[in-house]
Every structure is written in C-alpha cells, then in structure tokens.
C-alpha cells in the first residue's frame, strides 16, 4: 500500500526550523514529507517500511534524521545499523552521520575494517555481516535498521540479517526502513519478505518538474549494433551482441557522436557492456584526441578514488565505466551521459540516468546520448511495488539470462526526457491493442520456452498437470501470473487456481518471474522448451482429432506435435474469456477519465 505524500499528520512544524537546526544540512520539503511519513508509520505500529526516492534526491541525508527520531521499542535499545552493499554507499552514509551526529559514536564494518558492534551507529556491508561478525551485534540493543538500495533485499544475505535481528516478519522487534530509487526487481523476486508497506514515493519525473533535478535532453544515436539482439534471452544472441558492439565501426561511433553533440560538455559518463568494451571505447576516445579514462570493477581502490576525484574536479572530460557508477556515487557535475549498454531493466536504466540529474552550480540540463534506444524500449513509468515471488520460490533462478514512440515530428532534443516519458504513458492508453499485438510477437524473443500468445494480453505455458497463465491488466499495464493445477476429486477432475504473483510491471519481468517459479518446481526443460524434440515429431492422432472437432483447417501431413499443442492451447485458453477481456479493454478506453487523458494527448501533439 502506498501512502499519499501528504501525510495524515505531522509530528513537527512544517518549516522544521527548530527541529533540524542541529543537523549539518536542512532537509528539502519532500525530504521532510518523507521523514514525517516514516515516523507516522512507526507511530501507527508499522515496523518494516519502504521509501522510494529518485536517484539524486538525497536519500542518504535522511539517515541521521531517521536515527535521531526513530522510536525505541525496548529499554536501552538506542543503537542503529545502516546496511549497504557497496563501499561508495558506506562512505557516503559515514560522512553524513559524522557531520550531523557529532555526539554519536560511529563505526564502519566492511572488508578489513571491523567494528566493535557496540557503537551508537554502525555502517556495515551486508556481505561482511555473517557468522561471528554478525553475532557480535546484540539485537536487544538496536532500535533501527536502515537498508540502502533495498531492491537487493530478496537475496539470502539480507534475509540472514533480518532473521538475526528478529525482523523476518511484520511483528519485527526492531524498526526497519528500506530506501531505493527502484523499488522493484527485474527477476520477479518480491520484496515483501523484508518490507510490509511503501510509505513514501517520489518519481524522478516529479523531481524534475519541481526543479530538484535537472532536465535531461535526449538524442537517440543510430548505432550499427543490432539492438534486436538485446531483447533476446538467448545466450548466443547476447554473445553476438557483445561482438557487434566491439567492432571497430561500433566503437568509433561513440566518440564521434560525442564530438558532434557533446564536445562542449564538461563531464561525460559513458556506460559500456563489459570491461573489454570499456577499454576499447576509452582507447577510441583517446585516438581522437579526447582525454578519456576507464573505470571498472577490477580497478584498485586508490586508483578508483583518484579517478573519481579528478573527474569531480573536471580534470578530464570523459569517464568510461562498466557497472561501477550505477549506484551510490555522487558526482553532481556530470552533464552528459552516453548509454552504450543495452538494458531492458527499468532499475538499471533509472540508475544510469540518475547519475546525470543531480543539481550542480552552472548546470542547466543533462544531455543523454542514447545508442541503445533505451527510452523507447524500456518503460520508466513503473510504480514501486513489494509484490513478486518469495525468495524460496526463486532460489534456483537462472543466472544467464521498434516501434516509434510518438508522432514522427516529435523531437526529444527539444522536449527532453519528461515529455518522452509522459507521452509514452499516454500512448499506451490509446494504443493498448497494438501494444498487445506487439507483445504477442515479441514473446519469442523474451523466452526460449513454448509460451503461447492466445490473444488479448494472455500468455499460456502448459506442462505436466499444470498451466501457467500471464494476464495483462488493461487499466495499468501490469501483469498477473496464475497457476492452474489439475486435481482429481472422486471421479471429477478440476483445476485448482493459485495466484503466483501480481502487479508485475512488464511482460518481460512476468515471463522471468513465471520461469523462475517453474525452475523451482524442477520442471524438465524437455517438456517446456520451444525446441524440445517431441515438438518436432508429427502430431498425434489424439491432437488431430481434437483440432478437427474445433473446426480448424489442418494439413495433417505437415502438422507437428508442437504446433498442434500450441493450437490446442489457443482453443482452450484463447477463446474462453476472450470476449470478456475485449469488453474490459473497450470499457477502459471509453471511460470518461481516460477521454480526458486522450484529450491531453491531442493537446500535447498539437
């Protein structure tokens, strides 16, 4: 449940002048609203709450205030633990706490730096806290756990810490706050295992509108790399994509685009596919006389710190990185981003874009050179959610895994990202039918399993005595996964229904979540793969007879068992309920509220 940003009650005066003057930084209005929402939730008895705040909104600045005002649940339980997963996040949290809480003892527990477990405030690495290192923290002495970048919470490392502090359920014995800019996961895992309610949300588009973030200006760059490969789940396609992206032609297109569009920008951050790609792109910049440096995971700590500090001081104009500067690093002078790393994840794309949106003196906007058509391919209007599969349903999750947005006169260089996103949202309302058809065709790129698009936003996968169905919600574009299991009661066979997951933001995520669930059932690949041997064999007599009864025209000699199985699935799950779903869609598109939205669309286009 998402609370309104305007809280039901305030625990202090709106201006906060007397409350916050002891702190190093005064909170912005939305930060005050967020803090009020969290404390009100604790006051109402909620113990595990979530906050969704845009990248660059100053989440870390809230930590000292949470520590100061969070209620104690037991006598003498005043200690607080801040949990992060990256060194940069730990150092930021440490800096804010030391500046704003000078009278508190503050320690860090990460890598070779070991804390006593007795400090008033400890900033710790999630991955360092295990075995004896976790046991030194006495749960009875703690009032608050703060999880930064909490969208990682579904992993076992986080759940282990929650269990140690007695916070594994809504009857938690300690207050828990989880913060992130992206409160959803691309792998289908839910966050409800550690959090119970989203009490505050502020999207980065809202932050741009209110001038708390700079406006992005987007230019789509035509890249020679085949971006269709980026949407494929095939390992071979992903390898082919990496190879194409590292061709000499594709590599040099990146610095040439910078020279054409961004040579007047002071600080450009480039996102690349992997380390090899980063090094080649960096060398291409340097061959064209541009001072570029490369940063990736293997860069040692001292060199990394020097690179980032020099980049902050604008000593060189281009920093090329691979999966390092996506979370937590505060470099507000970045005024240009180059996205040369295809992604279908709203999480990752939001984090990448957020690197360039922070306010900075003399910075009017952030130019985004998008080589991957990211803003057309990935929806960033995704509401925060705790929904998804529980961790025990996803422990065996696999490790590997164009159409025009608007009218042809639309120019993202003029209108910027805010207009792109809003226009995309409206477009979905009046072209729901077309979008569903596009998704039906793209199902083959999203999975190698034999999903069948039966029409009107429904996708079906049959195996053993089970059927998984993904249905599209026409009102908000989310997806629901249902499982039907054939069971026998006496002589009667019936289907038992179970909702596996709901309100999944995209079809790709729904497919991933469903296949995560299937893998946990240890379903043989030979039953569900689109390339299974049995699907290539001739259709059985039983299949042919069923289809004949359905009055379908058949070429029995050419009909394979796989094609016949798909046709049967369409007959059973497509026809039944199709009219109901059609009526729902038509009703939604004709609703008065949406007519207003369509009117707004026409005005925007005009």
Curated annotation (Swiss-Prot):
Helicase ATP-binding domain location: 40-201
Recite the UniProt keywords alphabetically.
ATP-binding, Helicase, Hydrolase, Mitochondrion, Nucleotide-binding
Task: Supply the EC number(s).
Answer: 3.6.4.-
> What GO CC terms are in its UniProt record?
cytoplasm; mitochondrial matrix
Q: Which GO terms describe its molecular function?
A: ATP binding; ATP hydrolysis activity; DNA binding; helicase activity
Q: Which family does it belong to?
A: Belongs to the helicase family. IRC3 subfamily.
Signal peptide from the UniProt entry: none
Q: Which gene encodes it?
A: irc3
Q: Name one GO biological process term.
A: mitochondrial DNA metabolic process
The membrane-spanning stretches of this chain are: none
Give the motif span (DEAH box). 148-151
Q: Where found?
A: Mitochondrion
Q: Which organism is it from?
A: Schizosaccharomyces pombe (strain 972 / ATCC 24843)
In terms of InterPro entries, this protein maps to: Helicase/UvrB_N (IPR006935), Helicase_ATP-bd (IPR014001), Helicase_C-like (IPR001650), Helicase_Restrict-Modif_Enz (IPR050742), P-loop_NTPase (IPR027417)
Residues holding ATP: 53-60
Q: Which CDD domains match?
A: SF2_C_EcoAI-like
Helicase C-terminal domain location, by residue?
246-398
- This one is known as Putative mitochondrial ATP-dependent helicase irc3
